[in-house]
Amino acid sequence: MKKKETKYSLEKEIREALASGRSQKSIYNTLKDGNDDSVLADKVAEYLPLEVRNKTKYYNYIIIFLLVINAALSMNFLVIILAFFLFFYLKEGNGFGYRIMFLFSLLNIMYAFYTDKTGLVLVKTVLWSLLGISGILFYKLVFTNKTISGKVKKDKNDNYIFLD
């Protein structure tokens, strides 16, 4: 006999999956492939509003634009290759790309300080790198369901806020 899923048990499963560190997109794609869990997959999709996905897409374009300018300012062949590598991660909306972008900005600051550059180029490189870091923090605060300290955000009714 098949167990009937209730709204509470579906939400509980979603929360447990999110608490384990999986993204909603990952859960949704995994469940959509299986026949038994399609109801749960649709439930996950309800928690990811379309406007949130669209905002994330536009934010990706801004980060890609900053990334190209950052690579052009540094004039380093390896940095330009890394920029193209990151472009594809950001284009796919993979959260891993944002982590690499954060590290890329830190490396660019270090690169600016340890190379012999004129003062103006040094200042521009540091400013673009800081802008990239602040962009990552902005993304983390606005478009994810976790705070900087790693706690899951909740709304006024003590429900989890489900954002990818």
Whereabouts are the PLM-identified features?
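Basic, amphipathic alpha-helix used for nucleic-acid engagement in HTH/winged-helix/SANT-Myb modules
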Residues: 1-4, 56
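Hydrophobic alpha-helical bundles in membrane proteins
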Residues: 54-164
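Non-transmembrane, interaction-prone segments in cytosolic or luminal domains
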Residues: 2, 20, 24-26, 40, ...
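Short, non-transmembrane cytosolic segments of multipass membrane proteins
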Residues: 3-35
